[in-house]
Amino acid sequence: MRAQTIDIQELLEAGVHFGHLTRKWHPKMAPYIFMERNGIHIIDLHKTAAKMEEAGEAMKKIAASGRKIMFVATKKQAKEIVSELASKMGMPYITERWPGGMLTNFVTIRKAVKKMSAIDRMKTDGTFDTLSKREKLQIERTRENLEKNLGSIADMTRLPGAIFVVDAMHEHIAVSEAHKLGIPVFAMVDTNTDPTSVDFAIPANDDASKSIQKIVSYLYECVVEGLAERKSQKEEADAKAAEAPKAEAAPAQEAPKAEEKAE
């Protein structure tokens, strides 16, 4: 599914339009609310589609530039969806508790990741085998905890170019850290959330798994397109670089012939 082919009916069937109870609404979501039904706000899906297109195009450009997009979803109903699709894209993701300072104290987080790598080296170089049973158990537990919380960002060597969160209110710490560093924030925002708290707000039901699946799957397709563009550009650049030495060598081979003619 691409930006220009968003099917409103599919969004409707996925329950993307269901908001929260009217008494829990955030006034700044008013432009995205279509109506009230049985005490629940109904989101305008045409506006959802427009915001999906806007966010998708921006994420595509970020992916095409070679920068990473970190996906954040610690809510139970979003974890599996996000981890699966982010893994397919080769993008970092956080689906367990957000580690405080994940972005604002990235150097320390990187040290924790390096600790995980150090433990792995201990197992391969034989050091691990020299430890006592108790020490081995402690190290194994440390490794498991690090893998659970930071395993998906092990390959991150620098801050992401953007973050995407399933629920801006639920992931407010991640959103706050990103803002402090000027990192763009993409987010699904329900009717109880301030849409101006993020850079790219997608008004949608952020509680139902089908709704989350529909939005994240669309963004996945956009990012994959961006990655394909980058790969194509790189292949073209490599091809030109390979041709350059040949083009430079050709005149040099013809030079002796010119000298022979002069003689």
Which positions does each model-derived feature cover?
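Acidic-enriched and Gly/Ser
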Residues: R2-E147, I153, T157, E171, ...
